[in-house]
């Protein structure tokens, strides 16, 4: 469930049997519907609502948020839509695009700055230079995708630093090959600013993923990535924390 100002209006029956809400903006509407339905509407909320958990029938929250309760279902990482079928379909659709790249092929998922991380032009240059060095030293090809959050100056810096590298770079023009890159990759490198991207990379299951750290990790993302910094029960997620350069 989401909310849109253009769709605002009075709440009226018939009331749904179930509401699945996500994010804090949807909570007020979901709880209002539950009250008006005299409790006949159940609410499943995705993510930590950051309020009293008792009004919800179920809260699905990632382990690194650190919340507990009888109505809390703990997830490892974030919920996402990555499935083997989706990856295989996307890979089949896009398989000719990176066909000129050498193998092994590395998918590189680039996020962007947020309230806790900085991914500016200088950071983009550093990451891309390390990627170019990795590609040249291992003979690998790079399938690079940026996101809507990637600053244009960082995109330009990444393109410039990878100009002579065996790389295919998508930066917002045309159809997004994100899931195809995940499906076609032999390895995955993802910037550590987004729990969603890291979770999606880890969920591919077949290949080892590497998290490229950025500056100023907040507490909850530190908690999210901490189990992957050393061997342990997260090994089945096939992700590892890169503590230094992107060396083979």
Task: Give the role of each language-model region.
Residues 1-74, 80:
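Active-site and donor-binding regions of nucleotide-sugar-utilizing enzymes
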Residues 178-221:
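A donor-sugar binding/catalytic signature common to diverse glycosyltransferases
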Residues 47-51, 64-66, 78-80, 169-175, ...:
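Short, acidic/turn-prone active-site loops that include or flank metal/cofactor-
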Residues 52-53, 116-117, 150-155, 217-220:
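Short, charged/polar "capping" segments at the starts of alpha-helices
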Residues 104, 113-145, 151:
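Conserved catalytic-core segment of nucleotide-activated headgroup transferases in glycan assembly
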Residues 53-120, 243-247:
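A nucleotide-sugar donor-handling region in carbohydrate enzymes
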Residues 226-248:
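Leloir-type glycosyltransferase catalytic cores
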Residues 140-174:
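Catalytic donor nucleotide-activated moiety binding site of glycosyltransferases and closely related
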